[in-house]
């Protein structure tokens, strides 16, 4: 009695939010107007002629070093999605089998992770502009792996689990705020759509495949494998991410305090 929660209000709420979001996009986002403003701004700054020249020349392909960085970045994307989505997908079963949690009480930890990500997005963006995207992503991958390792150490649920999952959210924000901009940074403006599709192909493929692979381990080896599985893919993501040499963005730092005031008229 009372062990099976009613999920209907949750699904209804999500559906309502999605409909509201769709209506906002339909009626408040004027894509044609924004495109016209962008073109006018490009003409004002003399950018549009440069883009036409590039397109007429056939659109230069990515150089070998940039292409190599892009490939490693895309594999990193796949690996950290393999780690994160394995845990979020199977955590309910893990919490039930390993910790004896019932009645949807496991949802609190996942909610804390979402809150951790939500409160971190803006600070992470600020920190990334100061220290660079790659460093913040590597920090996020390490924090994610350590958090999953800490989750593996818990033999029963307690308040510290919420702290760990809050850190999972912070780590996930550190990764996601910076990964897609790095992909965009490597491509030309006319190729953004193509590379966006490639980025989401890798991320979605990982999200589809990881429940199958992690589920096999859970079923044939044991539920204890969930967090070690995630840690292994975090380690793989860290290795591939260290091989990325392009797509980062850091502001130029003046060599001296006086140079900070050296601005052309």
Which residue ranges define each predicted feature?
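Loop-to-transmembrane helix entry/capping segments in MFS-fold secondary transporters
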Residues: 103-104, 187-199
């Amino acid at each position: 009695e009372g062990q099976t929660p009613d999920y209907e209000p949750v699904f209804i709420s999500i559906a309502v939010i999605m409909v509201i979001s769709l209506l906002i996009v339909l009626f408040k986002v004027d894509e044609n107007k924004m495109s016209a403003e962008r073109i006018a701004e490009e003409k004002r700054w003399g950018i549009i002629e440069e883009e036409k020249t590039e397109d007429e020349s056939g659109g230069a392909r990515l150089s070998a070093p940039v292409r190599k960085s892009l490939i490693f970045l895309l594999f990193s994307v796949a690996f950290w999605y393999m780690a994160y989505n394995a845990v979020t997908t199977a955590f309910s079963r893990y919490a039930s089998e390993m910790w004896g949690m019932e009645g949807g009480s496991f949802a609190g930890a996942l909610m804390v992770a979402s809150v951790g990500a939500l409160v971190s997005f803006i600070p992470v963006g600020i920190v990334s502009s100061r220290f660079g995207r790659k460093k913040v992503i590597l920090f996020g991958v390490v924090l994610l792996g350590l958090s999953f390792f800490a989750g593996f150490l818990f033999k029963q649920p307690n308040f510290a689990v919420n702290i760990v999952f809050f850190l999972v959210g912070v780590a996930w924000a550190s990764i996601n705020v910076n990964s897609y901009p790095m992909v965009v940074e490597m491509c030309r403006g006319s190729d953004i759509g193509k590379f966006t599709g490639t980025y989401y192909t890798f991320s979605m493929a990982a999200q589809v495949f990881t429940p199958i692979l992690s589920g096999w381990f859970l079923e044939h080896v044991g539920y204890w494998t969930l967090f070690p599985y995630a840690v292994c893919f975090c380690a793989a993501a860290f290795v591939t991410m260290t091989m990325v040499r392009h797509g980062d963005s850091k502001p130029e730092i003046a060599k001296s305090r006086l140079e900070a005031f050296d601005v052309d008229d």
